Amino acid sequence: VQAFAQHAPQSGVIHIATHALFRADNPLFSGLLFADGWLFAHDLYDYTLDCYLATLSACRTGAALVEPGDELFGLMRGFLAAGAQSLAVSLWPAADAATLAVMVRFYSNIASGMPRGAALRRAQLETREEYKHPYHWAAFALVGAR
């Protein structure tokens, strides 16, 4: 958490690969587990991020509680409220090897100049050749600016 607090506000890209917890009973206490503690969704409201992309490579980081008015509460909302332009989030737990394959291709596509949404789509389609079942390659979605 301390390293995140120190480096995230001035980082253009944030990639977090860790364990996550979604709390449907209190989604603002959904969090990411770091070596020195939890970063909760409600903590993110105290940050000012200026990042092009935040990738939350952990189980169910895209999970959210839908409240009246179609308000979504969870880690996504916290990162977007803090200023992240876009998020790559997981919709379900995915195998580490398949996630690695998607992420390597995703960042390679971005580095070649592809927009974030197209980069993730291509990465998933390429990974589909190696891992046939959608469980492996379709876990990630892009939220925010594409």
Named regions from a protein language model:
Residues V1-R146:
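Catalytic cores of enzymes
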